[in-house]
Curated annotation (Swiss-Prot):
Residues 450-635 are annotated as: Flexible hinge. ATP binds at residues 71-78. Residues 1-27 are annotated as: Disordered. This is Structural maintenance of chromosomes protein 5. Forms a heterodimer with smc6. Component of the SMC5-SMC6 complex which consists at least of smc5, smc6, nsmce2, nsmce1 and nsmce4a. Signal peptide: none annotated. It holds the Pfam family SMC_N. It comes from Takifugu rubripes (Japanese pufferfish). Its main location: nucleus. The lineage of its organism: Eukaryota, Metazoa, Chordata, Craniata, Vertebrata.
C-alpha cells in the first residue's frame, strides 16, 4: 500500500556528481570491496524508512564520498544513523538509546521497516528489516527473500561492515565513549576497521598462542616441580625401604628370642625346683630340734605366775584404800579454801563502806562551796540594767531579714528552674545538630566508597580553603539537601553523578587553581564547575504549578531540595530544575494528554522519567521514558535552614544560660550578706536572753543545792559500828577453820601409811616379774623361730608343687612354639639355626646369631627382647607396600621425565610458531600505526597543535596488552597528554576523535564510516579546521563513503564537488517531495547570491 503523498520524504543526489576510482589497498592485501563506478562493495546506495522514529516514510540516496547530513535538532538526522545501524543487523546497545528495538517504531504505529540497498559487484544487496512493536521482534529479508538475522549478519560481515566498531560507526550517544576506550580496545577496533582481514585474526591467534604458551610453560614448570618432588619423595621412600629391611631383621631376631625364651624359662624353673627340694629337707630337720629345746622353759614360767597372783591382789586392795584417803584430803582442802574466801569477802565489804563514806564527805564539802559561789554571782547580777527593749529591736531586724531572704530564695528557685530548662533545651538542640552532622558524615563515606579521587580532593579543599578568593563548594551531593527523603530519587535521576561529585566555584580563577593542584599535580580524576556569572537560582518556571495540578503535578524539582545560591544557579541553568515538574500516579495515567497539551521537555511521574523532544517543523513529539532508580546518596537529607535555625537557637540558649548563672551568683552574694547579719543578731539576742534569765537561774540553783546539802548531812554512816561487826564475823569463821584443819591432818597421815605399804609389796612383785619377763622373752624367741620354721616348711612344699606344674606348662609351651611333639626333644638343627635377611640392593647377606649362642637367662633374653622390640617399634608406618611404592614411583619418574621432554620440545616448537606469527602481525601493524600517526600528526600540525599515535605495550610478549595510544597537545605551554575522558575538555576530545577517524579514512578497508554530531562542543576555530580536514580527506579519490551528521555549519566553509549535502527538514508545512524542484531551488539561490 502506497504511503500518503504528503508524508513521503525523498532525498536524491544530483547524478552529475563526480567520483574517483579506488586504487590499490595498503600493505598489498586484497580489499573486501571492489571499485566500480566510484563505489566500493558495501557502500550504501539507498536507505528507505517507514514508520521509523520521526519518519512516516522517507528515502535517502547518499553519494559515494562525503555525505553531509545537515538539519536542526529534532528533525531526524540521528534517525538515519539509527536506520543504518539497525538495518545492518546492529545491536541497540551500539546506539545507546532504547534497549528494545520496538522503541524505534514511530509512536502510535504497530510496525515499522528499514530497507538498505548496498552496492555489490555482480548485483546489489537489498536488506529489509520489519520491526513489530507487539512482540518486539524483527523479520528479515535479503533481496526480497525471507532470511534470519544470522544470515544478514554473515552478509554484512562479508562486506567488511562493522557497525559495532566505534572506528567505523560512531553514533551521537557513543561519541564520549570513544575517548573512554582502552588502548587495547582502540587497537582491536583499528585492526578491524583499516587493517588487512588477517591482521585481527593474527592478533587473536597470537593472543591464543601466548595463552597456550603460558599454559605449556606452566605445565613444564609444574611437571618439573612435580618430578623434583617425586624424586625427593622416592629418595625418602628408599630410606623407608632400608628401614623396612632393618625392621624385618629385628622382627626375625624377636621371633628367635621368643622361641628360645620358654626353653630358658623351663631350665630356670627346673633348677629352682631342685634347690627348693633341698631347702625343704633342711628346714624339717631344724624344726624338730627346736621343738625339743623349748619344754623346760615353759614349766619355769608356770611356777613364777603362781607366786605373782597373791601380790597382785594385795596391791589392788592398797590402791583402793589410798584413793579413799586422797579423796577425803581433797574435800577438807576445799572446805578450808571456801572459809578463807568468806573472810576476804567480809573485809572487802568493810573497805567499800569506808570509801563510800569518804566520797559522801567530799560531796558535802563541794556543795557548800558551790552555794557560796552562786550567792556571790547573784549579787553581781542584781546590779545589771534591763535588756528587754534591745531584744525587741533585734527580733524586728531578724524578721525583716527573713522577709528579704524569702524573696531572694523565691527568685533563686525561679532562676534555677529556668536554668534547668535552658540546659535541657541546649542539650536537645546540640543533639539535633550532632545528628545532622553525623548524617553528613554518612554521605561523605558513601562518596569515598564510590569515588575515592573526589574524596581525596575534598580533604585537600578543606585544608586549603584560604587559597581561594571566592566561594568554593564541596561536591554537590554534600551541598544538596532534599526536603523529603522520598524526593531524593527524582533529584539523583535528573542530575548526573559526574555533576553530583563536581566541585562548584564562584570564580573561574579559583577553579583553575584547584584543577591545577588536584588534577595535574595530585593526578586525581575530579570534576569542577564554574557557577554562572548571573544568578539563575530564583528563575521563574515557565508555567505556574497550580495550572499543572489537574494532571497530578504537585511541585517543581527545584522546590524539592535546598542548595547554596551558586549551586542552585548552575542546576537551573544546566538542568532546568525550575522547569521540571514532578507528578503522581495520576500523571502516569494521563501521560498522553500531558505530552500533547503541555509544552514540557522533562517531567517525572511517580516512578518514571520522561524526556520529550518536539520537532521544529512537524511539531511531532518523540519521547524517551526510563524508570526512576532508587536514591543512593541524597536520601540522607539535612535541612540547611533548619540547621542554621538550630545553631541560632543554641547560641541564644547558651547566652540565656550564662545570664541566669550571673544573676544566681549575684543573689548568692546577697544571701551571704544576710546570713552574716543574721548570725550577728542571733548571737547578740542569745547573749541578752542569757543575761535576762541568769538571776532567776541562779536563785533556782542555790535553792536546789541547799536541799541537796541537807539531805547529804542527814545520811551520814557509822563506821565504828560497822568495824566491830566485821571483826566478830571473821572470828567465827576462823573457829570453823581450826576444826577442818585437824581432820585434814589425820587424813594425810593415813594416806602416807597406806602408800608405804603398797611400795613394799610392789618391790617384791617387780623381782618376780623381771624373772618371768626374761623367761618369756627367751621362750618367745624360740616360739617365733619355731613358727617361722614351720611356715617356711609349708611355703617350700607349696613352692615345690607350684614349680612342678610351672615346669610342665613351660615345657609344653616351648615345644608348641618350636612346633615339636610332646615326646620330642630340642633338635641339633634348631640349636644351631642361622637366619639371613637379604635386601634387594645389598650384595652380601647378613647372618643373625645362632640359637645356641643367644642369652641363657630369662633376664638377659627379656632385656635383649625388649631392646629388639624397642628398635623395631622405632620403624613405624612401614609395611611391604613401601617396597612396591618405591618401585612404582621409580617407574613413574622415568615416564614423567619422558613426558616432560616431549612438553619442552612442544614448547620450543610453539615459541617458534609464535615468533613467525609475530612477524606476520607486528610488522604490518607497525607500518599501519606509522601511517595513521603520519596522518594524525599532519592533521594536528595543520591546526597549530600537536598529536601523535603510537603502538604501546608494557611487555613485548603480552600480545593481549598491546594497544594504540593517542597523545595530544592543544596549548603551547603544555606537554603531550594521553587522550582520556578526564584530562581533555569535551571539545578537545571531539577534535581528537574526529582527526583520528580521518587518519583512518584514506586507509579505507571499510565501505563507509558514520560520525554523528561530533562537532558539538568544538570552538569555531577548531570546528572550521576539522571541517576542512574532513572535506579534504573524505573527498579524495581513494577513500570510502563517509557520513558526517551535524546540526549546524559555520559560514564561508570550503566545499568540494565530491560532497553530497543532505538537508533534513520536517514540519507541518513541508512541501511534498513530488512538488520539490531542486533545479529551481538552486537557480533561485544563485540569483539571490548574484543580487547580494
Amino acid at each position: 500500500m502506497a504511503e500518503p503523498e504528503k508524508k513521503r520524504r525523498i532525498s536524491r543526489v544530483n547524478s552529475s556528481q563526480t567520483s574517483s576510482n579506488i586504487g590499490k589497498i595498503l600493505s598489498g592485501h586484497r580489499p573486501c570491496g571492489a571499485e566500480v563506478e566510484g563505489r566500493m562493495d558495501g557502500s550504501i546506495l539507498r536507505i528507505t524508512m517507514r514508520n521509523f522514529l520521526t519518519y512516516d516514510y522517507t528515502e535517502v540516496y547518499p553519494g559515494p564520498n562525503l555525505n553531509m547530513i545537515v538539519g536542526a535538532n529534532g528533525t531526524g538526522k540521528s534517525s538515519i544513523v539509527c536506520a543504518i545501524c539497525l538495518g545492518l543487523a546492529g545491536k541497540t546497545a551500539v546506539l545507546g538509546r532504547g534497549d528494545k528495538v520496538g522503541l524505534y517504531v514511530k509512536r502510535g504505529c504497530q510496525k515499522g521497516s528499514i530497507e538498505i540497498e548496498l552496492y555489490k559487484h555482480g548485483g546489489n544487496l537489498v536488506i529489509t528489516r520489519e520491526i513489530h512493536v507487539e512482540n518486539n521482534q524483527s523479520h528479515w529479508m535479503i533481496n526480497g527473500k525471507q532470511r534470519n538475522q544470522k544470515a544478514v549478519e554473515e552478509e554484512v560481515k562479508n562486506l567488511c561492515i562493522q557497525v559495532s566498531n566505534l572506528c567505523q560507526f560512531l553514533p551521537q550517544e557513543k561519541v564520549g565513549e570513544f575517548a573512554k576506550m582502552s588502548k587495547t580496545e582502540l587497537l582491536e577496533a583499528t585492526e578491524k576497521s583499516v587493517g588487512p582481514p588477517e591482521m585481527f585474526e593474527f592478533h587473536c591467534e597470537l593472543k591464543n598462542f601466548r595463552s597456550k604458551e603460558r599454559e605449556l610453560e606452566n605445565t613444564v614448570t609444574e611437571k618439573t616441580k612435580y618430578i623434583e618432588k617425586a624424586k625427593q619423595r622416592n629418595e625418602r621412600n628408599k630410606h623407608d625401604v632400608n628401614r623396612y629391611y632393618e625392621k624385618k631383621r629385628h622382627l626375625d631376631m624377636i621371633e628367635l628370642l621368643e622361641k628360645k625364651k620358654p626353653w630358658v624359662e623351663y631350665e630356670s624353673t627346673r633348677k629352682e625346683l631342685e634347690s627348693v627340694k633341698r631347702e625343704r629337707e633342711e628346714a624339717k630337720r631344724n624344726l624338730s630340734a627346736l621343738r625339743h629345746s623349748q619344754a623346760p622353759m615353759i614349766r619355769k614360767i608356770k611356777e613364777i605366775e603362781d607366786r605373782l597372783q597373791p601380790f597382785d591382789d594385795q596391791i589392788k586392795s592398797q590402791t583402793a584404800a589410798i584413793k579413799d584417803a586422797a579423796l577425803k584430803c581433797k574435800q577438807k582442802q576445799d572446805q578450808l579454801d571456801r572459809k578463807q574466801k568468806e573472810i576476804e569477802d567480809i573485809n572487802q565489804a568493810f573497805k567499800l563502806k569506808e570509801m563510800e563514806e569518804d566520797d559522801h564527805q567530799k560531796r558535802i564539802s563541794n556543795t557548800r562551796r558551790i552555794i557560796e559561789d552562786l550567792r556571790t554571782e547573784l549579787a553581781k547580777v542584781e546590779d545589771q540594767p534591763d535588756v528587754t527593749p534591745r531584744i525587741n529591736d533585734v527580733n524586728s531586724e531578724l524578721r525583716r531579714n527573713q522577709i528579704e531572704r524569702a524573696r531572694i530564695d523565691g527568685e533563686k528557685c525561679e532562676l534555677c528552674r529556668e536554668k534547668d530548662n535552658a540546659f535541657a533545651q541546649c542539650r536537645s538542640l546540640q543533639k539535633k545538630l550532632n545528628d545532622m552532622n553525623n548524617l553528613m558524615k554518612v554521605k561523605e563515606e558513601k562518596l569515598r566508597g564510590r569515588h575515592r579521587d573526589t574524596h581525596a580532593a575534598l580533604q585537600w579543599l578543606r585544608q586549603n580553603r584560604n587559597r581561594f578568593r571566592g566561594n568554593v563548594y564541596e561536591p554537590m551531593l554534600l551541598e544538596i539537601n532534599v526536603k523529603d527523603h522520598r524526593f531524593a530519587k527524582y533529584v539523583e535521576n535528573h542530575i548526573s553523578f559526574q555533576d553530583l561529585r563536581a566541585f562548584v566555584f564562584q570564580r573561574k580563577e579559583d577553579m583553575e587553581i584547584f584543577m591545577s593542584e588536584v588534577r595535574d599535580k595530585m593526578n586525581l580524576k575530579v570534576n569542577s564547575i564554574s557557577a554562572p556569572e548571573q544568578s539563575r537560582s530564583k528563575a521563574q518556571p515557565s508555567q505556574n504549578i497550580e495550572d499543572l495540578r489537574r494532571f497530578g503535578f504537585f511541585t517543581y524539582l527545584r522546590e524539592m531540595f535546598d542548595a547554596p545560591d551558586e549551586v542552585m544557579s548552575y542546576l537551573c541553568q544546566q538542568y532546568n530544575v525550575h522547569n521540571v515538574p514532578v507528578g503522581t500516579e495520576q500523571t502516569k495515567t494521563m501521560i498522553r494528554q500531558v505530552i500533547e497539551e503541555l509544552n514540557l521537555r522533562v517531567l517525572f511521574t511517580l516512578d518514571e522519567r520522561y524526556m520529550l523532544k518536539r520537532s521544529v517543523y512537524s511539531k511531532m513529539i518523540s519521547t524517551i521514558n526510563s524508570p526512576v532508580n532508587p536514591s543512593q546518596y541524597l536520601s540522607i537529607a539535612v535541612d540547611a535552614e533548619e540547621k542554621r535555625q538550630l545553631e541560632q537557637e543554641l547560641n541564644a540558649c547558651e547566652l540565656r544560660f550564662r545570664e541566669i548563672d550571673e544573676r544566681l551568683k549575684a543573689l548568692q552574694r546577697e544571701t551571704a550578706v544576710l546570713d552574716r547579719r543574721d548570725n550577728e543578731l542571733l548571737a547578740e539576742k542569745k547573749k541578752l536572753s542569757e543575761l535576762k534569765g541568769k538571776k532567776r537561774q541562779l536563785e533556782q540553783k542555790i535553792s536546789t543545792k541547799q536541799d541537796s546539802l541537807r539531805q547529804m548531812e542527814q545520811n551520814v554512816t557509822d563506821l565504828k559500828k560497822i568495824e566491830e561487826e566485821t571483826k566478830e564475823k571473821v572470828s567465827a569463821v576462823n573457829s570453823q577453820k581450826v576444826t577442818i584443819v585437824k581432820a585434814f591432818i589425820a587424813s594425810i597421815k593415813l594416806k602416807a601409811t597406806l602408800t608405804m605399804e603398797k611400795v613394799y609389796l610392789s618391790l617384791e612383785m617387780m623381782g618376780l616379774s623381771a624373772e618371768k619377763t626374761k623367761l618369756e622373752h627367751d621362750f618367745r624367741e624360740g616360739a617365733s623361730l619355731l613358727r617361722s620354721m614351720d611356715q617356711r616348711c609349708s611355703q617350700l612344699e607349696q613352692r615345690k608343687v607350684q614349680l612342678t606344674e610351672q615346669g610342665k606348662g613351660q615345657m609344653k609351651r616351648a615345644k608348641s612354639i618350636c612346633n615339636m611333639q610332646p615326646n620330642d626333644s630340642l633338635s641339633e638343627e634348631l640349636r644351631n639355626v642361622r637366619v639371613y635377611v637379604i635386601p634387594p640392593y645389598l650384595c652380601v647377606p647378613s647372618p643373625l646369631m645362632a640359637f645356641a649362642k643367644l642369652p641363657d637367662t630369662p633376664d638377659d633374653i627379656d632385656s635383649m627382647l625388649n631392646e629388639e622390640r624397642s628398635r623395631s617399634e622405632c620403624f613405624t608406618g612401614l609395611s611391604e607396600n613401601v617396597v612396591d611404592e618405591y618401585n612404582r614411583s621409580d617407574q613413574e619418574i622415568k615416564e614423567l621425565e619422558n613426558e616432560l621432554e616431549e612438553k619442552k620440545n612442544a614448547l620450543e616448537s610453539y615459541r617458534q610458531n609464535i615468533s613467525e606469527a609475530k612477524e606476520r602481525w607486528l610488522n604490518p601493524l607497525k607500518q599501519l600505526v606509522e601511517q595513521i600517526n603520519e596522518k594524525f600528526t599532519a592533521f594536528f600540525r595543520s591546526m597549530n597543535c600537536a598529536g601523535e599515535v603510537d603502538l604501546h605495550s608494557e611487555k613485548e610478549e603480552d600480545y593481549d596488552k598491546y594497544g594504540i595510544r593517542i597523545r595530544v597537545k592543544f596549548h603551547s605551554n603544555t606537554q603531550l597528554h594521553e587522550l582520556t575522558p578526564f584530562h581533555q575538555s569535551g571539545g578537545e576530545r571531539s577534535v581528537s576523535t574526529m582527526l583520528y577517524l580521518m587518519s583512518l579514512q584514506e586507509l579505507n578497508r571499510c565501505p563507509f564510516r558514520v560520525v554523528d554530531e561530533i562537532n558539538q562542543g568544538m570552538d569555531p576555530i577548531n570546528e572550521r579546521r576539522v571541517f576542512d580536514i574532513v572535506v579534504g580527506t573524505a573527498c579524495k579519490e581513494r577513500t570510502s563513503q563517509y557520513f558526517f551528521i551535524t546540526p549546524k555549519l559555520l559560514q564561508n566553509l570550503k566545499y568540494a564537488e565530491e560532497m553530497t549535502v543532505l538537508c533534513v527538514h520536517n514540519g507541518a508545512y513541508m512541501l511534498p517531495p513530488n512538488q520539490w524542484d531542486d533545479k529551481a531551488f538552486l537557480r533561485r539561490c544563485l540569483q539571490r547570491k548574484a543580487k547580494a
